[in-house]
């Protein structure tokens, strides 16, 4: 409603409800006491500062003072809000004695009921409510015209305090009684009131979202001191009211096209039928938004009491818990089998894989984030990657973690882009400015981001999360927007091996399509291999049948899901310090890892660097948090070192049976192996006795090499052959070595180790079978034959192909 000018003497309608509420609220500010003194005297004194204009009032205090006043504020909040602000201005002016008129505002906190974004309906318009959600988009700060001063262009009358209804609003009529101007007004910018204004968008959290539904979103309007107080990815509670605003984006859409050569005069009929605005016509394009008066970070609940998680400590949590909750946490911390009981409660439907469960459990607790003197941030979150064959419960691990953790985001690598994982720069529908929209890593800030099918991601998308995994920030420089955003999240990834099955004869890096920088940023790698084991298969089948037959009774848990979540939230607040003994053990264990990496011919899955030392520190701190300890002890370091070994050591390699590839060879080598004895140390033999027709006995000798001997021998052959190829290329002759030349060269190298003719024959057969495996199985060596189109060859072709030229595959890289 327009406020009348006193000089003109125009009448104003008296608002009895607003005036009565203003008087009651001012009495509340002047009379409400806490601990014997008026509570809001000191906060009101702080409003004397030029950059402060909002007084925060606890709604619980209003309910204690007058229940009728609290009911009136809740039900008629938008109606009485200007009167509440006027009472705050009067109270501040009386208490401080301000000589200038300063507009003050009120912000309510601790509103009892919290609503979800999905529950916002038109019935809540104008009432005081509190909603919670996750910020997914933030807009830049703009000035907003709140109260305008206009000048009539017909009679030059000044019209003050014209309230703006969420869009530019002209006075309905000139205040001068002798002037009936309704359209021709000009805004006086110097005498108008502007406030800072920021628009953000929040959406439902993952925990509140019904399964299979699209998250609902709502726009939040922040004013004055609230601007730039929220960040994309964080979760907040917003207190305010639901309003209806004109949909400017629809109004700004282009209408009919401009026609050239119109018969009308210039400027005539530009607005269609004129005069309808004077009759009260309004556009019907509106949408709902939320006008916030206070913002608080979303908090965890203990005993029904909220605590700000950014400033909370373990002692604060203890004070806010009930006696039963505290006794249960204390009992759990003294449990000798707490480590095992927690993984049983977290993953009751998954059989086995206890090491993976322990690693994920320590990821939930996390390490301690630190900041050096040079302001360099050291991450405390633990990153875990699970690599395994299909049907080894990889996705089940991720699903259960995303359901359990309160701040967890589940996404698939193949269906996610770089912008969807980090952050996107999009154009605003109304102002057409570029704004930042949070991705999965930002939405999982201070939580866990579960990425399934991690190996299916494009290479450019993997590169986009390098910074987020180590520095825990996301830097954006696109479309004129430059920003560094927080991504303090742990990453739990699942990947499938190349070709679907994990090849034990290859290293971890050769089994997955991940770059070395990405692999080094994971603290733990767990390899799950689907093996045929009668005992394990029976136990897994029994577990699955029990789950399908009776889901509730088949799961035995020492603690409930809520108790585990409460314990994890409480234990995460500890910040253990590394003691002198634990630090000494960390240094010694890191030295052992480095020595073993350089001295065991590639027994590790990847190169041991300082990042593995930092991983050991984070795991040790997580173990200390699990026990609610303020110091990292030696047993914590020992368990972290053992768990890290599970991922650093290569999966135990099986022996190489050279005779397994006889069917791929040109010649069947069975008859050549009869009556052959192997007395050398390089290979072991196994004798199979085959009875044919009960009379004759055929013995087949099988050559078996350990994986390490196989790699050393094949590397020696490849390096020699490449050296010969390089020499032949320089001399200009045919490149490559004949098969017989390779065998002869090897026998010359081991001539001093051969003591008998039988051993010479054994060595010769061994190297020939090794060459066959490198040709037909590993495809490291390429035979240059004259005819390889058919396996049935004539005598002439057979004689030519018995001793082909051998060359190393040009794409083969020696480990």
From Swiss-Prot:
Keyword field contains Chloroplast: no
Xref: PROSITE patterns: MCM_1, MCM_2
Motif (Arginine finger): 520-523
UniProt xrefs under CDD domains: MCM6
Span list, region Disordered: 672-693
Gene Ontology CC annotations of this record: MCM complex; nucleus
Enzyme Commission number(s): 3.6.4.12
Subcellular locations according to the entry: Nucleus
Domain MCM as annotated: residue spans: 338-544
Binding positions (ATP): 391-395, 496
Any GO BP: DNA replication initiation
Entries under Gene3D superfamilies matching the protein: 1.20.58.870, 2.20.28.10, mini-chromosome maintenance (MCM) complex, chain A, domain 1, Nucleic acid-binding proteins, P-loop containing nucleotide triphosphate hydrolases
Subunit composition and interactions: Component of the Mcm2-7 complex. The complex forms a toroidal hexameric ring with the proposed subunit order Mcm2-Mcm6-Mcm4-Mcm7-Mcm3-Mcm5. The heterodimers of mcm4/mcm6 and mcm3/mcm5 interact with mcm2 and mcm7.
Protein purpose: Acts as a component of the Mcm2-7 complex (Mcm complex) which is the putative replicative helicase essential for 'once per cell cycle' DNA replication initiation and elongation in eukaryotic cells. Core component of CDC45-MCM-GINS (CMG) helicase, the molecular machine that unwinds template DNA during replication, and around which the replisome is built. Acts as a component of the MCM2-7 complex (MCM complex) which is the replicative helicase essential for 'once per cell cycle' DNA replication initiation and elongation in eukaryotic cells. Core component of CDC45-MCM-GINS (CMG) helicase, the molecular machine that unwinds template DNA during replication, and around which the replisome is built.
UniProt miscellaneous comment: Early fractionation of eukaryotic MCM proteins yielded a variety of dimeric, trimeric and tetrameric complexes with unclear biological significance. Specifically a MCM467 subcomplex is shown to have in vitro helicase activity which is inhibited by the MCM2 subunit. The MCM2-7 hexamer is the proposed physiological active complex.
Protein family membership: Belongs to the MCM family.
Name by which UniProt lists this protein: DNA replication licensing factor Mcm6
């Amino acid at each position: 409603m327009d406020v009348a000018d006193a000089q003109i003497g125009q009448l104003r309608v008296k608002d009895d409800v607003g005036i009565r509420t203003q008087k009651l609220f001012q009495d509340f500010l002047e009379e409400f006491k806490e601990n014997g003194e008026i509570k809001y005297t000191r906060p009101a004194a702080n409003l004397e500062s030029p950059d402060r204009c909002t007084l925060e009032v606890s709604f619980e205090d209003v309910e204690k003072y007058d229940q009728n006043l609290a009911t009136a504020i809740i039900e008629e909040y938008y109606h009485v809000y200007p009167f509440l602000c006027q009472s705050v201005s009067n109270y501040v002016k009386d208490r401080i004695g301000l000589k200038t008129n300063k507009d003050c505002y009120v912000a309510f906190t601790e509103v009892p009921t919290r609503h979800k974004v999905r529950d916002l309906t038109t019935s809540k318009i104008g009432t005081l409510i509190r909603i919670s959600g996750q910020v997914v988009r933030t807009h830049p700060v703009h000035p907003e015209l709140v109260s305008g001063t206009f000048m009539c262009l017909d009679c030059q009358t000044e019209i003050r305090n014209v309230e703006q209804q969420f869009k530019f609003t002209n006075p309905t009529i000139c205040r001068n009684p002798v002037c009936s101007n309704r359209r021709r007004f000009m805004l006086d910018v110097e005498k108008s009131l502007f406030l800072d204004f920021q628009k953000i968008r929040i959406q439902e959290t993952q925990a509140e979202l019904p399964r299979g539904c699209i998250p609902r979103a709502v726009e939040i309007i922040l004013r004055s001191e609230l601007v730039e107080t929220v960040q994309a990815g964080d979760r907040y509670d917003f207190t305010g009211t639901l309003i209806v605003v004109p949909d400017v984006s629809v109004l700004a859409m282009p209408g009919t096209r401009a026609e050239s050569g119109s018969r009308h005069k210039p400027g005539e009929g530009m607005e269609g039928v004129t005069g309808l605005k004077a009759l009260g016509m309004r556009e019907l394009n509106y949408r709902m938004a939320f006008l916030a008066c206070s913002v608080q970070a979303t908090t965890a609940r203990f005993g029904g009491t909220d605590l700000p998680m950014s400033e909370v400590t373990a002692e604060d949590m203890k004070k806010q818990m009930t006696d039963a909750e505290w006794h249960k946490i204390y009992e759990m911390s003294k449990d000798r089998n707490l480590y095992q009981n927690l993984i049983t409660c977290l993953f009751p439907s998954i059989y086995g894989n206890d090491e993976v469960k322990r690693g994920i459990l320590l990821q939930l607790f996390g390490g301690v984030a630190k900041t050096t003197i040079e302001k360099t941030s050291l991450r405390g979150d633990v990153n875990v990657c699970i690599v395994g064959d299909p049907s080894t419960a990889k996705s089940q691990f991720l699903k259960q973690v995303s359901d359990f953790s309160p701040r967890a985001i589940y996404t698939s690598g193949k269906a996610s882009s770089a912008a969807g994982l980090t952050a996107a720069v999009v154009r605003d529908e109304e102002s057409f400015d570029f704004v930042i929209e949070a991705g999965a890593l930002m939405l999982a800030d201070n939580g866990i981001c579960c990425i399934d099918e991690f190996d299916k991601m494009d290479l450019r998308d993997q590169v986009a999360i390098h910074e987020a995994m180590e520095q825990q920030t996301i830097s954006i420089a696109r479309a004129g927007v430059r920003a560094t955003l927080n991504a303090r999240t742990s990453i739990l990834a699942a990947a499938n091996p190349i070709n679907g099955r994990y090849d034990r004869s290859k290293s971890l890096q050769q089994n997955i399509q991940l770059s070395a920088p990405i692999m080094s940023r994971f603290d733990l790698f767990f390899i799950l291999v689907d093996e045929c084991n009668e005992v394990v298969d029976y136990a897994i089948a029994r577990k699955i049948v029990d789950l399908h037959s009776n889901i509730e009774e088949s799961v035995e848990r020492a603690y409930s899901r809520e108790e585990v979540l409460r314990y994890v939230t409480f234990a995460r607040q500890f910040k253990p310090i590394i003691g002198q003994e634990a630090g000494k053990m960390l240094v010694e264990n890191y030295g052992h890892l480095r020595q073993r990496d350089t001295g065991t011919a590639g027994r590790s899955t990847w190169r041991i660097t300082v990042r593995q030392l930092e991983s050991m520190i984070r795991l040790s701190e997580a173990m200390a948090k699990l026990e609610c300890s303020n110091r990292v002890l030696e047993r914590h370091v020992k368990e972290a070192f053992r768990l890290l070994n599970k991922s650093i050591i290569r999966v135990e390699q099986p022996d190489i049976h050279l005779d397994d590839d006889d069917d791929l060879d040109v010649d069947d080598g069975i008859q050549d192996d009869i009556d052959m004895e192997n007395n050398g140390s390089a290979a072991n033999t196994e004798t199979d006795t085959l009875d044919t027709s009960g009379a004759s006995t055929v013995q087949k000798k099988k050559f078996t090499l350990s994986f390490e001997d196989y790699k050393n021998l094949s590397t020696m052959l490849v390096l020699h052959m490449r050296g010969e190829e390089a020499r032949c290329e320089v001399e200009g002759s045919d490149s490559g070595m004949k098969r017989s030349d390779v065998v002869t060269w090897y026998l010359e190298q081991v001539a001093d180790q051969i003591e008998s003719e039988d051993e010479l024959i054994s060595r010769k057969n061994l190297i020939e079978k090794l060459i066959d495996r490198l040709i037909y199985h590993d495809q490291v060596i390429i035979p240059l034959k004259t005819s390889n189109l058919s396996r049935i060859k004539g005598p002439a072709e057979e004689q030519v192909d018995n001793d082909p030229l051998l060359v190393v595959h040009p794409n083969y890289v020696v480990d």
